[in-house]
Amino acid sequence: MRKLSVYLAVATTLLVVAPSFADDALTSDAIILKLAPAHKTRAVGSASGGLTAEQQAFIDSLKGRKRQIVVEERTELTKVVKEAHLPTVDLEVYFDFDSSVILPRAVPTLVKLGQALSSDRLKTSSFLISGHTDAKGAPGYNQRLSEARAGSVKAFLVGNFHVDPRQLISVGYGAEDLKDPSDPEAAENRRVTVVNLVAP
Protein backbone atom coordinates (compact mmCIF):
# COMPACT_ATOMS: atom_id res chain seq x y z
CA MET A 1 0.00 0.00 0.00
CA ARG A 2 2.81 2.36 0.88
CA LYS A 3 4.52 1.53 -2.41
CA LEU A 4 1.40 2.45 -4.35
CA SER A 5 1.09 5.74 -2.48
CA VAL A 6 4.68 6.50 -3.46
CA TYR A 7 3.72 5.80 -7.08
CA LEU A 8 0.95 8.37 -6.82
CA ALA A 9 3.27 10.96 -5.31
CA VAL A 10 5.76 10.33 -8.09
CA ALA A 11 2.97 10.72 -10.63
CA THR A 12 2.05 14.15 -9.32
CA THR A 13 5.67 15.27 -9.64
CA LEU A 14 5.99 13.85 -13.14
CA LEU A 15 2.84 15.53 -14.35
CA VAL A 16 4.01 18.90 -13.03
CA VAL A 17 7.73 18.98 -13.79
CA ALA A 18 8.20 16.36 -16.49
CA PRO A 19 5.19 16.31 -18.81
CA SER A 20 7.34 14.76 -21.55
CA PHE A 21 6.99 11.45 -19.69
CA ALA A 22 3.22 11.48 -20.21
CA ASP A 23 1.19 10.87 -23.33
CA ASP A 24 -0.24 14.39 -23.67
CA ALA A 25 -2.88 13.30 -26.19
CA LEU A 26 -4.31 10.66 -23.84
CA THR A 27 -6.14 12.58 -21.13
CA SER A 28 -8.46 11.02 -18.58
CA ASP A 29 -11.37 12.51 -20.55
CA ALA A 30 -10.10 10.84 -23.72
CA ILE A 31 -9.96 7.49 -21.91
CA ILE A 32 -13.51 8.01 -20.65
CA LEU A 33 -14.73 8.69 -24.19
CA LYS A 34 -13.03 5.53 -25.47
CA LEU A 35 -14.42 3.34 -22.69
CA ALA A 36 -17.89 4.79 -22.17
CA PRO A 37 -20.65 2.54 -23.56
CA ALA A 38 -22.40 3.93 -26.62
CA HIS A 39 -26.06 4.72 -26.08
CA LYS A 40 -27.82 2.92 -28.87
CA THR A 41 -31.34 1.59 -29.22
CA ARG A 42 -30.49 -1.84 -30.55
CA ALA A 43 -31.08 -5.33 -29.30
CA VAL A 44 -28.44 -6.80 -27.03
CA GLY A 45 -26.47 -9.45 -28.86
CA SER A 46 -27.44 -8.12 -32.28
CA ALA A 47 -25.13 -8.17 -35.31
CA SER A 48 -24.03 -4.61 -34.51
CA GLY A 49 -22.62 -5.66 -31.17
CA GLY A 50 -23.55 -6.01 -27.52
CA LEU A 51 -23.36 -8.85 -25.01
CA THR A 52 -25.66 -11.83 -25.20
CA ALA A 53 -27.07 -13.22 -21.96
CA GLU A 54 -24.65 -16.14 -22.24
CA GLN A 55 -21.66 -13.83 -22.71
CA GLN A 56 -22.71 -11.69 -19.76
CA ALA A 57 -23.04 -14.77 -17.56
CA PHE A 58 -19.55 -15.86 -18.59
CA ILE A 59 -18.07 -12.47 -17.68
CA ASP A 60 -19.92 -12.44 -14.36
CA SER A 61 -18.41 -15.85 -13.54
CA LEU A 62 -14.91 -14.34 -13.77
CA LYS A 63 -15.49 -11.42 -11.40
CA GLY A 64 -13.83 -11.77 -8.03
CA ARG A 65 -12.06 -14.92 -9.20
CA LYS A 66 -9.34 -16.06 -6.81
CA ARG A 67 -7.63 -18.52 -9.13
CA GLN A 68 -5.86 -17.69 -12.39
CA ILE A 69 -7.94 -17.61 -15.55
CA VAL A 70 -7.17 -20.65 -17.71
CA VAL A 71 -6.39 -20.83 -21.43
CA GLU A 72 -9.93 -21.68 -22.53
CA GLU A 73 -11.33 -18.76 -20.55
CA ARG A 74 -8.76 -16.37 -22.03
CA THR A 75 -9.71 -17.51 -25.51
CA GLU A 76 -13.39 -17.05 -24.76
CA LEU A 77 -12.78 -13.56 -23.34
CA THR A 78 -10.99 -12.51 -26.52
CA LYS A 79 -13.88 -13.83 -28.59
CA VAL A 80 -16.49 -12.02 -26.47
CA VAL A 81 -14.66 -8.68 -26.63
CA LYS A 82 -14.36 -8.85 -30.41
CA GLU A 83 -17.85 -10.16 -31.14
CA ALA A 84 -19.57 -7.68 -28.82
CA HIS A 85 -17.45 -4.70 -29.98
CA LEU A 86 -16.82 -3.70 -26.37
CA PRO A 87 -15.21 -0.28 -25.74
CA THR A 88 -11.44 -0.70 -25.61
CA VAL A 89 -8.30 1.39 -25.12
CA ASP A 90 -4.65 0.36 -25.59
CA LEU A 91 -2.13 1.93 -23.23
CA GLU A 92 1.65 2.05 -23.19
CA VAL A 93 2.61 1.04 -19.66
CA TYR A 94 6.34 0.79 -19.00
CA PHE A 95 7.84 -1.83 -16.71
CA ASP A 96 11.34 -2.71 -15.59
CA PHE A 97 12.97 -5.10 -18.05
CA ASP A 98 11.95 -8.68 -17.36
CA SER A 99 9.80 -7.46 -14.47
CA SER A 100 6.28 -6.49 -13.44
CA VAL A 101 7.52 -3.42 -11.54
CA ILE A 102 5.89 -0.28 -12.93
CA LEU A 103 8.42 2.35 -14.02
CA PRO A 104 7.96 5.98 -12.90
CA ARG A 105 7.43 7.16 -16.49
CA ALA A 106 4.37 4.89 -16.72
CA VAL A 107 2.70 6.40 -13.68
CA PRO A 108 1.14 9.47 -15.38
CA THR A 109 -0.70 7.20 -17.83
CA LEU A 110 -1.95 5.01 -15.00
CA VAL A 111 -3.07 8.07 -13.03
CA LYS A 112 -5.15 9.17 -16.01
CA LEU A 113 -6.58 5.67 -16.26
CA GLY A 114 -7.42 5.66 -12.56
CA GLN A 115 -9.12 9.04 -12.84
CA ALA A 116 -11.16 7.74 -15.76
CA LEU A 117 -12.23 4.46 -14.14
CA SER A 118 -13.25 6.21 -10.92
CA SER A 119 -15.21 8.91 -12.78
CA ASP A 120 -19.00 9.14 -12.55
CA ARG A 121 -19.38 7.78 -16.10
CA LEU A 122 -17.34 4.64 -15.53
CA LYS A 123 -17.29 3.86 -11.81
CA THR A 124 -20.15 1.34 -12.04
CA SER A 125 -18.59 -0.57 -14.95
CA SER A 126 -16.43 -3.67 -14.82
CA PHE A 127 -13.18 -3.83 -16.77
CA LEU A 128 -10.83 -6.35 -18.29
CA ILE A 129 -7.17 -5.42 -17.81
CA SER A 130 -5.06 -7.53 -20.13
CA GLY A 131 -1.28 -7.63 -20.31
CA HIS A 132 0.43 -8.39 -23.64
CA THR A 133 4.02 -9.09 -24.66
CA ASP A 134 5.77 -9.33 -27.99
CA ALA A 135 6.80 -12.72 -29.36
CA LYS A 136 10.36 -12.64 -28.01
CA GLY A 137 11.09 -15.30 -25.43
CA ALA A 138 9.41 -18.55 -24.46
CA PRO A 139 5.59 -18.62 -24.58
CA GLY A 140 5.24 -19.84 -21.00
CA TYR A 141 7.52 -17.14 -19.67
CA ASN A 142 5.74 -14.41 -21.65
CA GLN A 143 2.43 -15.68 -20.32
CA ARG A 144 3.53 -15.45 -16.69
CA LEU A 145 5.11 -12.02 -17.21
CA SER A 146 1.98 -10.61 -18.86
CA GLU A 147 -0.18 -11.96 -16.01
CA ALA A 148 2.08 -10.30 -13.43
CA ARG A 149 2.06 -6.99 -15.29
CA ALA A 150 -1.72 -6.96 -15.62
CA GLY A 151 -1.87 -7.70 -11.89
CA SER A 152 0.44 -4.75 -11.15
CA VAL A 153 -1.85 -2.39 -13.05
CA LYS A 154 -4.87 -3.73 -11.16
CA ALA A 155 -3.09 -3.28 -7.83
CA PHE A 156 -2.18 0.31 -8.75
CA LEU A 157 -5.81 1.16 -9.55
CA VAL A 158 -7.18 -0.50 -6.42
CA GLY A 159 -4.54 0.98 -4.13
CA ASN A 160 -4.56 4.54 -5.44
CA PHE A 161 -8.06 5.10 -6.77
CA HIS A 162 -10.07 2.69 -4.62
CA VAL A 163 -11.50 0.91 -7.65
CA ASP A 164 -13.43 -2.12 -6.41
CA PRO A 165 -11.17 -5.14 -7.15
CA ARG A 166 -14.28 -7.15 -8.01
CA GLN A 167 -14.79 -4.80 -10.96
CA LEU A 168 -11.36 -5.54 -12.42
CA ILE A 169 -10.47 -8.80 -14.16
CA SER A 170 -6.72 -8.98 -14.82
CA VAL A 171 -5.55 -11.41 -17.48
CA GLY A 172 -2.24 -12.12 -19.16
CA TYR A 173 -2.21 -13.04 -22.84
CA GLY A 174 1.52 -13.29 -23.44
CA ALA A 175 1.97 -13.07 -27.22
CA GLU A 176 -1.39 -14.69 -28.02
CA ASP A 177 -3.12 -11.50 -29.19
CA LEU A 178 -0.56 -9.39 -31.07
CA LYS A 179 -1.54 -5.88 -32.07
CA ASP A 180 0.75 -6.14 -35.11
CA PRO A 181 0.81 -9.80 -36.22
CA SER A 182 2.93 -8.85 -39.24
CA ASP A 183 5.79 -7.90 -36.88
CA PRO A 184 5.55 -10.17 -33.81
CA GLU A 185 8.51 -8.52 -32.07
CA ALA A 186 7.30 -4.94 -32.58
CA ALA A 187 7.19 -2.68 -29.53
CA GLU A 188 3.50 -1.90 -30.05
CA ASN A 189 2.70 -5.49 -29.15
CA ARG A 190 3.95 -4.82 -25.60
CA ARG A 191 0.93 -3.11 -24.11
CA VAL A 192 -1.88 -3.13 -21.58
CA THR A 193 -5.43 -3.18 -22.91
CA VAL A 194 -8.47 -2.04 -20.92
CA VAL A 195 -11.96 -3.14 -21.97
CA ASN A 196 -15.30 -2.01 -20.55
CA LEU A 197 -17.21 -5.23 -19.90
CA VAL A 198 -20.59 -3.56 -19.56
CA ALA A 199 -22.80 -4.12 -22.59
CA PRO A 200 -23.05 -0.91 -24.67
PLM regions and their residue ranges:
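Short coil/turn segments at secondary-structure junctions
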Residues: 93-101, 136-141
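Sterically constrained small-residue positions within well-ordered secondary structures
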Residues: 13, 84-86, 120, 161, ...
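Surface-exposed acidic loop/strand-edge motifs in secreted or periplasmic proteins
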Residues: 76, 80, 90, 97
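Periplasmic OmpA-like peptidoglycan-binding domain that tethers envelope proteins to the cell wall
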Residues: 132-200
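Periplasmic peptidoglycan-binding/anchoring modules of Gram-negative envelope and division proteins
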Residues: 95-130, 155-159, 194-200
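N-terminal targeting leaders that direct proteins to extracytoplasmic destinations
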Residues: 2-84
